[in-house]
Amino acid sequence: MNIQVINKSKHPLPAYATELSAGMDIRANISEPISLAPMQRCLVPTGLFIALPQGFEAQIRPRSGLALKKGITVLNSPGTIDADYRGEICIILVNLSAETFVIEDGERIAQMVIARHEQAVWKEVEVLDETERGAGGFGHTGRG
């Protein structure tokens, strides 16, 4: 699939690390480092602008290594970039650790997954179809 992209950053375009990777790493495009204190959040620009085909979205997800080792994650995970959005892709990061984390220019801060989606059409009814599970939730299956 071809996706139109404008790269106003100083960094390479997002790319798949391996042949079977689902996500592409996205880099910070900042003029100076950002110090992210514990429990602080910030909006990090990427310098990327994209035009997705109809029926697709870009999901912005945390990088597992950054989350595990440093406590840095995407606050609204997954962040959604709609096919009709044409602004700069910016990432909302939050520091869930007890230590300040410094984001450097060009640092890989999140990953982007391109995914198909459907738009739902609501059908109002008086009663829902019965299922074995019914209304059970939040640990109902005994596994949590």
From Swiss-Prot:
It catalyses: dUTP + H2O = dUMP + diphosphate + H(+). CDD domains: trimeric_dUTPase. Pfam families: dUTPase (PF00692). SUPFAM superfamilies: dUTPase-like. Its EC number is 3.6.1.23. It comes from the Bacteria. Keywords: Hydrolase, Magnesium, Metal-binding, Nucleotide metabolism. The keyword Zinc does not apply. Substrate binds at R63, S64, G65, N76, T80, I81, D82. Pathway: Pyrimidine metabolism; dUMP biosynthesis; dUMP from dCTP (dUTP route): step 2/2. It is an enzyme of class 3 (hydrolase). Its cofactor is Mg(2+). One of its GO terms (molecular function) is dUTP diphosphatase activity. Signal peptide: none annotated. The keyword Hydrolase applies. InterPro entries: dUTPase, dUTPase-like, dUTPase-like_sf, dUTPase_trimeric. This enzyme is involved in nucleotide metabolism: it produces dUMP, the immediate precursor of thymidine nucleotides and it decreases the intracellular concentration of dUTP so that uracil cannot be incorporated into DNA. HAMAP family: dUTPase_bact. Belongs to the dUTPase family. PANTHER family: DEOXYURIDINE 5'-TRIPHOSPHATE NUCLEOTIDOHYDROLASE. This is Deoxyuridine 5'-triphosphate nucleotidohydrolase. It comes from Bacteroides fragilis (strain ATCC 25285 / DSM 2151 / CCUG 4856 / JCM 11019 / LMG 10263 / NCTC 9343 / Onslow / VPI 2553 / EN-2). The gene is dut.
